[in-house]
């Protein structure tokens, strides 16, 4: 089992499955999932209105040292997350500390704002590709891409492989086993 704190960050309009399924996989692997919000509201709703989430904590109340990984769901949320410096700083600091940063679909928009994609192989929803390239990333059309501590995926259909890659990366760091 994987022990420790992993993190999912959330904002209004997240893609429901891109938050729910990684959370479930991480919990099933034995991690403690902490939901971090921007603080813009008390309850965040999924884009498809299937989920309502109350964050455990606000981004300006935590630091990268509190967590082992960050998972960024897609949907409309990443574009809103970019408006909050505390969210950007948390992602940048975690990345610079060698923590796993995993983003799916539109999630890499936040990676652009955190200025951590320069020279990195990444993937995303196809409409985000030009933004990633303009930020200096090497965009590829593959289901899941890992470049160092950065893991990216394209879309909801890629979630099973995305989850497996996150858990394998955490297992490689912490030397424990986990089932997805």
Predicted regions and their residues:
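Short, thiol/selenol-centered motifs that function as redox-active sites or metal-ligating centers
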Residues: 104-106
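Anionic-ligand binding patches
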Residues: 122
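Exposed beta-strand and adjacent loop surfaces of beta-rich binding modules
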Residues: 119
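Extended, subdomain-level signal for the structured scaffold at the beginning of enzyme domains
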Residues: 1-97, 101, 110-116, 129-180
């Amino acid at each position: 089992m994987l022990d420790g704190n992993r993190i999912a960050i959330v904002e209004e309009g997240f893609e429901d499955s891109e938050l729910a399924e990684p959370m479930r996989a991480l919990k099933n692997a034995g991690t403690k999932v902490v939901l971090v919000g921007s603080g813009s509201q008390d309850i965040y709703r999924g884009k498809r209105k299937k989920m309502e989430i109350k964050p455990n904590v606000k981004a300006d109340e935590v630091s990268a040292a509190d967590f082992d990984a960050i998972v960024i769901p897609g949907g409309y949320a990443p574009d809103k997350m970019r408006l909050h410096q505390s969210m950007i700083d948390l992602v940048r600091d975690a990345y610079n500390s060698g923590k796993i940063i995993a983003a799916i679909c539109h999630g890499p928009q936040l990676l652009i704002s955190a200025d951590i994609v320069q020279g990195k192989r990444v993937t995303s929803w196809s409409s985000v590709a030009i933004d990633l390239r303009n930020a200096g990333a090497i965009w590829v059309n593959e289901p899941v891409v890992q470049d160092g501590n950065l893991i990216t995926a394209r879309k909801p259909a890629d979630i099973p492989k995305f989850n497996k890659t996150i858990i394998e990366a955490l297992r490689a760091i912490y030397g424990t086993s986990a089932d997805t």
